[in-house]
Amino acid sequence: VEIMISLIQFFSSSVLLKQEKTEQEIPDKKTINKEYWKVAFPAAIEGVLLNLMLLADLIMVGMLGIEKAAAVGIVSQPKMILQMIVSAAGVAITAIVARRKGEGDEEGLNSCIKQSLLLLGLLYFLFVCLSFIFSKNIVSFAGANEDYIEYASIYFQYIALSVFFKALCVVLSSAQIGVGNTKIVLISGMIGNALNVLLNYLLIFGKYGFPEMGIQGAAIATVIGNAVIFVILLYSVTKGDYGINILKKGSYHFTKKVLAPLQEIGTNSFLEHIFERIGLFIFARMIASLGTVAMGTHHYCILLWDLYYYFGVGMSSASASFTGRKLGEKRKDLAILYMRAAQYSGLWISIFVGIIFYLLKNSIFSLMISDERVILLGSSVMMIISLLIIPQTQAQVTAGVLRGAGDNRFIAIYSLFISAILRPYLAYIFAFIWKLGLVGIWIAFFSDEFLKMLLAQYRIQKGIWLQKKI
């Protein structure tokens, strides 16, 4: 009982609320939940749909044969590395734009968008040029062999161009998330990704009079899809909605007010991504050494886990948006209440999804594959995933609050300790010393998310994020 009371007190925000007393009007719980999900739901669904599009992409490319599939797979690593910088910058852009929106500083808000577009546009233009010149060297360094290096080199050149448009999309979508306009992010993503899947089908296989281009067609489809998303998002920031109008407000001249927080928050986020990548790289090596069945089963488990993971990413983005805006409005009490709403709703949703995963664990794998060994092992892993997503959701929401406040250095620190060091160490113990195999790997994943949840909540309870200036 004492342990339960201690846990309730640890996760309670009552102490923080008492410290932030206000005479201003406070919305009721129903209003807060409604407003939160108005922002969170489109962001969450956009992440899930993106993951489904990537899955469709993978299936169509896989039909071309192992060499073409390997070429696409080997390019995914340099592609992720290219995207890490703008992904980190996106966290900073959301935090800055949300804070300026809350402060009512539309000039500063639009300056952030314009300067970020200029800076990252120039940077990624340079990346594209270098990628075209050194494409074969890059994919060779990534591990491509002679069987498919030519395919991989050509594919990477197109993907580098798609990453350029993706980078610009991240700048604009991060800004829209910052002001709470996730609906346009969902709409643009749905249109662009649907077009991507359609063009994949037409260009990969040469349907309805289109040329049969194989993986080159898949890459071209990705470029066009991202370009369309960029055009839609670019139009959205010229209309004046939510205070965003880059045609009439803001400046392209670089200023300390934009670059200082962009550098600070972005660097911390970049380090977080680096530490996560290190941990995942070590994990991949461990899983590969467990054998083909374990590797294949893990791949299917990741695909299923990602569907919910990206839903949590949407909740995290919404939490960052509300935190930044409410702190900008000098309403720390509301920042706490929106965080509480996200945590509570996230808890019940994760429990509900966890129960579904647990009850349907055998059926899900039976639909995807007929190998009994994979079904048995996958069902065991799904039991862990059904529990894992509960602390994972809390960790995502709470980390989103810290990012929205600009207090994300702590996240980078615990990502180094947990993801890059502790998680691989625990995975080695569980999988190899205790001989639990792939199940041990996923127990380490659970430990990772549970510790992140505790440490993020510890930082929240310290209240430092409420005082953070951007």
Language-model features: where?
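Short alpha-helical transmembrane segments in multi-pass integral membrane proteins
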Residues: 2-43, 97-164, 210-267, 323-388, ...
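Helix-terminus/linker motif at the lipid-water interface of multi-pass membrane proteins
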Residues: 52-70, 139-146, 202-213, 274-307, ...
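Small-residue-rich hydrophobic transmembrane alpha-helices
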Residues: 58, 69-129, 166-185, 297-359, ...
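N-terminal transmembrane alpha-helices
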Residues: 28-59, 63-64, 77-92, 96, ...
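Short runs within selected transmembrane alpha-helices of multi-pass transporters and secretion channels
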Residues: 90, 94, 159-177, 185-193, ...
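Transmembrane helical elements of multi-pass membrane transporters/channels
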Residues: 38-57, 158, 192, 225-229, ...
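Alpha-helical transmembrane segments and their lipid-water interface positions
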Residues: 50, 54-57, 61, 83-90, ...
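Transmembrane alpha-helix boundary and packing residues in multipass membrane permease domains
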Residues: 43, 47, 58-59, 76, ...
